Amino acid sequence: MTKLVIHLVSDSSVQTAKYAANSAIAQFTSVKPKLYHWPMIRNLELLNEVLSKIEYKRGIVLYTIADQELRKALTKFCYELKIPCISVIGKIIKEMSVFSGIEIEKEQNYNYKFDKTYFDTLNAIDYAIRHDDGQMLNELSEADIILIGPSRTSKTPTSVFLAYNGLKAANIPYVYNCPFPDFIEKDIDQLVVGLVINPNRLIEIREARLNLLQINENKSYTDFNIVQKECLEVRKICDQRNWPVIDVSTRSIEETAALIMRIYYNKKNKYNK
């Protein structure tokens, strides 16, 4: 079998590039591919990190990047290394422009519907909904990512955002003085990520939630000492098992998900420098 290294670089989820790569690979019976995923590459700092990885593990580069500056930097780098650098839809866009006489817009908006990626995304969204808030723990083995954290640390919206990028994410709440599921005692292949937040900020979010629901009796839910202990305990659980922890105090859902995706694909890529 001929080994073939393929780097998938994208400013979104790499699902389009991945689908194109797998479709092409299917035409070869004697190829053993190794795919490296580099999602959410949206600035030069992130791109430069990826370029160093590409130089270390040289192979074909497939990309879907809208930003012109990033595209130029990527293609120039690959040209200097003398490795193929292929825009997954660049040729299609160019031919459509020539045929129609319509100029290509500076910033392209990629929309892909009803392909394998689309249905994979639907399955991931369905999984995220069914495995929200600690439900159906017997199916955690099907997850790509498992999020743990105190209540109201954006686990659910982050799971859904990951699902929109084709990743199956389950989330499990940590509640002070309540037994945590025994899955943490097992060796698991899934990426487990702890989400924590500044206790004062978390109390504000919880108080707003209680006011919205017109609930005034749950004192422990907004007690500073308990909230602080919940966050500290999640950190402790993760530190003991070498699971990454993300502080979401100042991060948007998209930023949190992007960081999780980078951790996930870095783990999957398994670089050993």
Swiss-Prot record:
It catalyses: N(tele)-phospho-L-histidyl/L-threonyl-[pyruvate, phosphate dikinase] + ADP = N(tele)-phospho-L-histidyl/O-phospho-L-threonyl-[pyruvate, phosphate dikinase] + AMP + H(+); N(tele)-phospho-L-histidyl/O-phospho-L-threonyl-[pyruvate, phosphate dikinase] + phosphate + H(+) = N(tele)-phospho-L-histidyl/L-threonyl-[pyruvate, phosphate dikinase] + diphosphate. Pfam families: Kinase-PPPase. GO terms for molecular function: ADP binding; ATP binding; phosphotransferase activity, phosphate group as acceptor; protein serine/threonine kinase activity. ADP binds at residues 149-156. Its EC number is 2.7.11.32, 2.7.4.27. InterPro entries: Kinase-pyrophosphorylase, P-loop_NTPase, PPDK_reg. Belongs to the pyruvate, phosphate/water dikinase regulatory protein family. PDRP subfamily. Bifunctional serine/threonine kinase and phosphorylase involved in the regulation of the pyruvate, phosphate dikinase (PPDK) by catalyzing its phosphorylation/dephosphorylation. HAMAP family: PDRP (MF_00921). This is Putative pyruvate, phosphate dikinase regulatory protein.
